[in-house]
Amino acid sequence: MWSYEGKCGFLLLSVYKEQVLDSYSPLTKENGISSNPRYIKRKFPFDSGFPFTRKLPAKVESFLCLPLFLSFLVANLILWLSFHSARVGHQKLSYHLLEWKAFPSSFRNKESKATCDLSSWSNPYFKRKAQIPFSFSRYLLKYLF
């Protein structure tokens, strides 16, 4: 008999197929079963693709691809929305902190705050600090969608 190994389940199935199904095979008249192949198909319908490997109809296979495709679209939409909201939220939240790092003296002065807002976008330090966290997500969004 078979020894227990990692492939024990497969071996048991193959032993079952050899012992049970072959004992009902109509090669000889000793077992008393008719040699009609339709009878064997009716009694053992899984014999055509053992175990569980019967091919599905083409319409069923195409419908099985539909949920996979829809879940892929939903996942992409969620990723895009999360990247977009994180990018906008980061710009809103970190605007004043970056402005304070770029212009520490003029940020304390209330009168020069308007000029500081306009000139901060031309400051290379501000641009560099604002673009580092989302450069990779911007790259992904540009080439994925």
UniProtKB/Swiss-Prot annotation:
Query: Transmembrane helix among the record's keywords?
Result: yes
Q: What sections of the protein cross the membrane?
A: 63-83
Q: Which UniProt keywords apply?
A: Membrane, Mitochondrion, Transmembrane, Transmembrane helix
Subcellular location, record wording:
Mitochondrion membrane
| GO CC terms in record | mitochondrial membrane
**Topology relative to the membrane:** Single-pass membrane protein
Q: Anything else the record notes?
A: A stretch of 270 kb of the mitochondrial genome is duplicated within the centromere of chromosome 2 resulting in the duplication of the gene. The expression of the duplicated gene (At2g07697) is not demonstrated.
Protein name from the UniProt record: Uncharacterized mitochondrial protein AtMg01230
Query: What organism is this sequence from?
Result: Arabidopsis thaliana (Mouse-ear cress)
Q: Which taxonomic lineage does the organism of this UniProt entry have?
A: Eukaryota, Viridiplantae, Streptophyta, Embryophyta, Tracheophyta
